[in-house]
Structure formats: C-alpha cells, structure tokens
C-alpha cells in the first residue's frame, strides 16, 4: 500500500479548527453591526436601491499587517468625507497564481516558505477584527474553500477571481457565503463564464467541506439568490 498512496505527499500537518480561532478572536458587537449593515448596503447598491457607488479600494494584498492597519485608519477617516461613494477596504489574504509565487498571508505569513498557515489564519482574523473595529467594512477574495469558516463573519463583500470563476468548487462555495459575492470574468475575458458562475451560485448545492469544529462535512447550501453580481476589470485612460 505504501507504494501507491501519497507518493507525492511529504507530510500532513494538523491545523487548528475554525471554532478555536472564532472563540479566541470573537467578533465584537460593533464589528457585527458593521458587517450586517454593510452587507445590506452593498446589496442595495448592487440592486439599485441605493444611489451611491460602491468603491472597494486597498492594497493588492495584505503582507504587512501594521502598514495595512495604518492604511485602514486613513481610509476610515477619508470615507467620512465622501458622500456619493460607499467605501469598503480591500483586504485580500489569498493570491491565486498563474504559475508559482507567494500565495498570500494565510498560506505563508512569514514570506519565507515555512507555510505556517495556523499563524496566517490567526493574523488574518486578527487583522479583520482590527479593521472592522474602526468601523470600516472589508472585502476579500475567497480562494481556499476552507477559508470562509475561519474568516467570513468579518467580511462584507466576497470575490471569486478570474482564475477560479469557472471552477465548480468555487461556485459551490459561493452558494453558501453570507455576503454579496462578485464574480470576475475569466482570464480570457469571457463575461459568459462569470454569468454562468452567478447562475450556478444562486442554486442549492451539496459538497464536501469542513464545519466550525474542523470536521469533514457535507455542506448543504441554499444559494446566494440576491447576492451574486458581475465584476469587470477597470481600464483607466489618461
């Protein structure tokens, strides 16, 4: 059996269950209200019930949490002076790669190929807690299907990126998310791929995942009927 199983696996490293992080870094009443209110506002903007423009802005990804938090403080103050825009901070912890490269704060928080994902998840959840405590809603791309169990309660807007929008795994995951979800058009530029993804995510699904206790589970979803929408790349002509 040793000659046919796990031939290319070097090691299995157990990881802390989501519930441990949720208990250690609980969401405060203030942050919970920020998340709940901002999800409603974003949904209203997407459906044309709120005339403001949704502006999701921030670093390409978070690698320095101290610098990221300083940015969040400045953005929070700036957002108070803008009336026609609803500002949400881009807080991306996972980076899909076309080939190879650094995969983000969760995957390798020390940027040294040690892949201390326990530390990465803890840092990510702590950072989300710090940002929402300022009153700033957050947006992130969900890449690994396990990640939402660790972080989603702090997130107001979720993204499915160009490299994963055609993936059944990510369409299923999106069908169970509790916030508005934007699907990007595919890497080849096809909008239809994202439209199909939106339709798939609006349906009910059953798929393999984990629960808050970290147990392998069959996840049954209701579908994000009123939450999915299309996101397109912006080209600035100067």
Regions found by a protein language model. Name each.
Residues 228-234:
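Conserved small/polar residues in nucleotide/adenosyl-binding loops
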Residues 55-57, 87-91, 138-140, 181-183, ...:
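Hydrophobic faces of well-ordered beta-strands that scaffold small-molecule active sites
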């Amino acid at each position: 059996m040793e000659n046919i199983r796990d031939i290319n696996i070097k090691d299995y490293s157990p990881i802390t269950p989501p519930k441990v992080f949720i208990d250690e870094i609980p969401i405060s009443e203030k942050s919970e209200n920020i998340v709940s209110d901002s999800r409603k506002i974003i949904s209203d903007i997407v459906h044309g019930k709120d005339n403001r423009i949704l502006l999701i802005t921030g670093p390409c990804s978070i690698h320095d949490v101290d610098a990221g938090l300083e940015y969040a403080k400045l953005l929070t103050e700036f957002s108070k002076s803008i009336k026609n825009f609803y500002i949400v901070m881009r807080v991306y912890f996972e980076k899909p790669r076309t080939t190879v490269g650094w995969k983000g704060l969760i995957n390798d928080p020390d940027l040294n190929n040690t892949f201390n994902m326990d530390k990465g998840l803890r840092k990510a959840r702590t950072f989300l807690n710090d940002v929402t405590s300022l009153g700033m809603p957050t947006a992130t791309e969900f890449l690994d299907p396990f990640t939402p169990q660790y972080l989603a309660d702090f997130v107001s807007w979720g993204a499915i990126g160009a490299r994963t929008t055609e993936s059944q795994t990510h369409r299923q995951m999106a069908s169970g998310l509790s916030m508005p979800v934007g699907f990007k058009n595919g890497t080849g530029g096809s909008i239809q791929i994202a439209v199909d993804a939106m339709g798939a995510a609006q349906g009910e699904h059953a798929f393999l995942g984990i629960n808050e206790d970290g147990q392998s589970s069959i996840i049954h979803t209701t579908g994000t009927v009123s939450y999915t929408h299309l996101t397109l790349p912006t080209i600035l002509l100067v």
